[in-house]
Design a protein with these regions (language model features):
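C-terminal alpha-helical cap/extension of soluble enzyme domains
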Residues: 197, 208-254
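Alpha/beta enzyme core
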Residues: 1-11, 18-34, 42-178, 189-194, ...
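Short catalytic/ligand-gating loop segments at beta-alpha or beta-beta junctions
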Residues: 181-186
Length: 254
């Protein structure tokens, strides 16, 4: 299946841009039959997007969703024009997700759903290739407070349902257009339990139910971001291995 390798601004600074690009170029050589995209997540400004475009990324996201609507259009259009001139595709965002992811920090009070009546104008004026919308997902492993959730018979938190009415209205206004959901990790409870069992402390970590993600994927959603799930799986597995094999110190063994 095609593969999108997504890099945030923070990950790019941590791992080094050149190393990342060359690793992906090596993956393309080693796996010639798999289409691979190197994508910038939540590019905060034109300069960051331009640096990634010039440096070998094949896809970028410009996130000006915190700006007023007209300014979001202006910034996004500038990135789109430069990216398209260089054969790079652009994801944009309307609406603001709550939660924390690297430099992206949005409180519940600052978050807001996407307004469907804005999407057609935004896409037409910017020329973006895909659009991230806000329908109730949230960044991080702590997507919802206990007050926002109910509890099932096991006492586990059950998050509020996504706003599929908003998604449906967006799809009506943008038929066939690629839609993106950020903050959509399901936060598998087996990994949360694994982290907690082996020395971690992640009470009430809860994600988006997978059946809701499958429903979104059957609609126009073509990209679902699940970074927290990858972190949980890796962290839980490493914690478990180190607890069960305290004599081991070679990272190649875990």
């Amino acid at each position: 299946a095609p593969l999108i390798l997504q890099v945030s601004k923070g990950a790019r600074a941590y791992a080094n841009h050149t190393y990342l690009v060359k690793l992906v170029e090596a993956a393309v050589i080693e796996c010639p039959n798999i289409p691979i995209a190197l994508h910038l997540d939540h590019g905060p400004d034109f300069e960051t997007c331009k640096s990634c475009i010039d440096g070998g990324f094949t896809s970028v996201m410009i996130d000006a969703s915190s700006k007023p609507f007209a300014e979001n259009i202006e910034i996004t259009k500038k990135v789109v024009e430069y990216a398209h001139d260089h054969g790079v595709v652009v994801e944009a965002e309307l609406g603001a997700l709550a939660g924390i992811e690297d430099d992206v920090k949005v409180s519940a009070e600052e978050s807001h759903y996407t307004h469907p009546e804005e999407v057609q104008e935004f896409v037409e004026k910017t020329g973006c290739d895909s659009l991230a919308i806000a329908i109730g997902t949230s960044h991080g492993a702590y997507k919802f407070t206990a007050a926002q959730c109910t509890r099932n018979e096991k006492g586990e938190l059950v998050p509020p349902p996504l706003r599929f009415d908003i998604l449906d209205e967006v799809v009506k206004r943008l038929p066939g257009f690629p839609i993106v959901l950020h903050g959509s990790s399901s936060v598998p409870q087996e990994f949360v339990r694994m982290v907690n069992e082996f020395g971690g402390k992640m009470p009430d970590a809860v994600g988006i139910p997978e059946e809701q993600l499958r429903k979104a994927a059957r609609s126009a959603v073509c990209k679902i971001n699940i970074d927290s799930d990858l972190r949980l799986a890796m962290t839980g597995t490493i914690r478990k291995f180190m607890a069960e094999h305290p004599d081991k110190f070679d990272p190649r063994e875990y």
